[in-house]
C-alpha cells in the first residue's frame, strides 16, 4: 500500500476510445487494472487495421476473457455520456499536465521523463518509499 497507481485514459483515436470504454465497464478497480494490463499487453494484436468493427471484436474478446459479458461491453461502447466523460478528461489532462505524448507518467505531481528506462523508473520510485 505504499504506491498508488492511477490510470487516466487519453485516447488518441476511436480504437483507443473504445478500449477505454471497455476498461471502464468493470466496476471493480482491481479487475479494471488487470483488464487494462491485458489491453496494453495485447495492443499490437487489436490496434491494427482500419476496420473498427474488427478492432472492437478483438478488444471485446480481451474484455470477455476478464469476465465482462458481451452485452455489458456493447452497452459500454454505446454509452455516449461515458464517451463524453472520457474525452473531456483527456482535454482537461492535456491542459493541466501539458501531455504531449503517451504514455505520460507523473510521480507525486512531477512529470517523469525517463519512462522508457525501467531501471531508472524503479529507482525513482524506490527513492520515495
Map each language-model feature to its residues.
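Structural alpha/beta surface segment adjacent to cysteine/selenocysteine redox centers
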Residues: 1-64
Amino acid at each position: 500500500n505504499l504506491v498508488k497507481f492511477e490510470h487516466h485514459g487519453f485516447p488518441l483515436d476511436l480504437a483507443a476510445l473504445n478500449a477505454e470504454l471497455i476498461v471502464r465497464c468493470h466496476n471493480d478497480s482491481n479487475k479494471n487494472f488487470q483488464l487494462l494490463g491485458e489491453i496494453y499487453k495485447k495492443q499490437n494484436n487489436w490496434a491494427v487495421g482500419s476496420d473498427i468493427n474488427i478492432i472492437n471484436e478483438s478488444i471485446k474478446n480481451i474484455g470477455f476473457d476478464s469476465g465482462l459479458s458481451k452485452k455489458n461491453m456493447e452497452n459500454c461502447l454505446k454509452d455516449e455520456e461515458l464517451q463524453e466523460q472520457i474525452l473531456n478528461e483527456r482535454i482537461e489532462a492535456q491542459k493541466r499536465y501539458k501531455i504531449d505524448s503517451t504514455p505520460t507518467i507523473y510521480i507525486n505531481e512531477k512529470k517523469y521523463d525517463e519512462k522508457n528506462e525501467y531501471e531508472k523508473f524503479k529507482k525513482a520510485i524506490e527513492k520515495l518509499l
